[in-house]
Design a protein with these regions (language model features):
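Accessory alpha-helical/coil subdomains and C-terminal extensions
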Residues: 38-136, 211-258, 266-267, 288
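Short, glycine-/small-residue-rich phosphate/pyrophosphate-handling segment
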Residues: 6-45, 204
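Conserved hydrophobic site in ankyrin repeats
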Residues: 275-276
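Conserved ankyrin/ankyrin-like repeat signature
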Residues: 271-272
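ATP/nucleoside-binding phosphotransfer catalytic cores, i.e., glycine-rich phosphate-binding loops
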Residues: 134-238
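Ankyrin repeat (ANK) core detector
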Residues: 261-262, 291
Length: 291
């Protein structure tokens, strides 16, 4: 809350009531933040204002729900676990992690000190889409030395919105030496994820690197490996209806995915189920009969 709950005029009561309603009546198995009539995914949320009722924001993802006269929930955006397993709490985090924010006049001594043992992981905050000055070969060399000794370095943008793109030359230089692209993770999420991944002693270095680019709990956006129109039946329907734009295909997706899921499950077509899940279909969704 921004205004204490004991004040006559407070946002605390509305935030508490809204949070309780969302938790009690909606199946959203996530850690979330409810504030000012919006429900955000926790690992996508940052605090952007300390003196406004619009205090929290999810810069790279729309809110999961919005509470107005009616409560609108974007069920497609809910991140559900792909498997059913007992609930386990992992209560250890690696503390040997840090932040290194790049700026034009940063000294090599500053960089070197941030990468020295016992540091095991660093979130590198770079410019724009994951870039840094290409002429600073001294920084590149220090980063490579740290990576070679097993330090995980994650490239995150200093910008609030957008994601790291390794297609740019200066961003590709970092990628080529082993810096892991952080996609559109917030700095806070990247640091927390790094602490979690590094604490898993049962994982080798390659597994830890792979987990940093994997979408574990909806903290980053992953490019879909198979476009929706590549599913044969969707492609045929789109052609028949002369649908071409992304908006039209998205509308088609919402219209037919429940039927496709039911058909695939009924016929035992595991390959189709897998393709539908890769394209964002919720295997726990209800059909048009509410089942």
């Amino acid at each position: 809350m921004q205004i204490p709950v004991f004040e006559v005029r407070s946002d605390g009561r509305e935030n508490l009531i809204g949070a309780l309603i969302m938790a009690a009546y909606y199946d959203i198995p996530e850690v979330t933040v409810y504030f000012n009539n919006k429900l955000f995914r926790g690992n996508r949320t940052i605090k952007v204002d300390n003196s406004s009722l619009e205090a929290f924001e999810s810069p790279n993802m729309l809110p999961i729900a919005h509470m107005d006269i009616d409560i609108k929930v974007n069920y497609d955006s809910i991140f559900r676990s792909p498997s059913v397993a007992p609930f386990v709490i992992h209560d250890r985090l690696c503390r040997n992690v840090g932040l290194l924010r790049i700026f034009p006049s940063i000294s090599i001594e500053n960089v070197r000190a941030s990468l020295q043992p016992p540091t095991e992981g660093v979130v590198l905050q770079t410019f724009g889409a994951g870039n840094m000055p290409s002429h600073r070969t001294d920084i590149i060399d220090e980063l490579k030395k740290a990576i070679d000794r097993g330090c995980l370095i994650i490239n995150c943008s200093q910008c609030v919105r957008g994601q790291v793109d390794v297609q740019y030359l200066t961003g590709k230089i970092l990628y080529d030496i082993g810096v892991i692209p952080g996609s559109d993770m917030t700095t806070e999420a990247a640091l927390t994820k790094l602490s979690y991944v590094l604490s898993k002693d049962c994982w080798g270095l390659s597994k830890k690197k792979a987990m940093m680019v994997k979408n574990i709990r909806g903290e980053l956006t992953v490019t879909q490996p198979k476009p929706l129109r590549d599913i044969e039946i969707v492609s045929q329907i789109a052609r028949f209806l002369h649908l071409n734009t992304s908006h039209e295909l998205e509308f088609l997706r919402h219209a037919i995915l429940p039927q496709l899921l039911c058909h695939a499950a009924d016929s035992g077509n595991v390959e189709l189920l897998r393709a539908l899940r890769e394209n964002g279909a919720n295997l726990s969704a209800i059909d048009y009969n509410g089942r």
